[in-house]
Amino acid sequence: MSDNPQEYELDWDVEKRLKLNDAGLVPAIVQADGTNEVLMMAWMDTHALAYTLATRRGTYFSRSRNEYWIKGLTSGNVQEVTGLALDCDGDTVLLTVKQTGGACHTGAHTCFDNDVLL
């Protein structure tokens, strides 16, 4: 099994239900297994999604760095994917994960606990 997400192809039955944006990406919402707390939002392309399905490791595409990002590979804050679903329109992916360490790139538990508006 390769550690390069670009070498993974998404099953056609899944890919044909997926609605990617003009950049070839789909938003991915990540929830904590057991609590359903929203941990983060990231972007995936078909290779990141295929790699995630094959390895059960949260894998995303960084728009700012223009590269794949396997969550925890450098930080140790690994995501073990326990569930993955498409929404009714196929334009959003929902991942359920067992999170080790912080989910946010800042090291925080969630990306949504620092700037609460209501």
UniProtKB/Swiss-Prot annotation:
InterPro entries: PRA-CH (IPR026660), PRib_AMP_CycHydrolase_dom (IPR002496), PRib_AMP_CycHydrolase_sf (IPR038019). It is found in: Cytoplasm. One of its GO terms (biological process) is L-histidine biosynthetic process. Its cofactor is Mg(2+); Zn(2+). Its main location: cytoplasm. It catalyses: 1-(5-phospho-beta-D-ribosyl)-5'-AMP + H2O = 1-(5-phospho-beta-D-ribosyl)-5-[(5-phospho-beta-D-ribosylamino)methylideneamino]imidazole-4-carboxamide. The gene is hisI. Pathway: Amino-acid biosynthesis; L-histidine biosynthesis; L-histidine from 5-phospho-alpha-D-ribose 1-diphosphate: step 3/9. Pfam families: PRA-CH. Catalyzes the hydrolysis of the adenine ring of phosphoribosyl-AMP. One of its GO terms (cellular component) is cytoplasm. The keyword Cytoplasm applies. This is Phosphoribosyl-AMP cyclohydrolase. Zn(2+) binds at C88, C104, C111. Binds 1 Mg(2+) ion per subunit. Binds 1 zinc ion per subunit. Mg(2+) binds at D87, D89, D91. One of its GO terms (molecular function) is magnesium ion binding. It comes from Corynebacterium glutamicum (strain ATCC 13032 / DSM 20300 / JCM 1318 / BCRC 11384 / CCUG 27702 / LMG 3730 / NBRC 12168 / NCIMB 10025 / NRRL B-2784 / 534). Keywords: Amino-acid biosynthesis, Cytoplasm, Histidine biosynthesis, Hydrolase, Magnesium, Metal-binding, Zinc. Its EC number is 3.5.4.19. Belongs to the PRA-CH family. NCBIfam families: PRK00051.1 (NF000768). Homodimer.
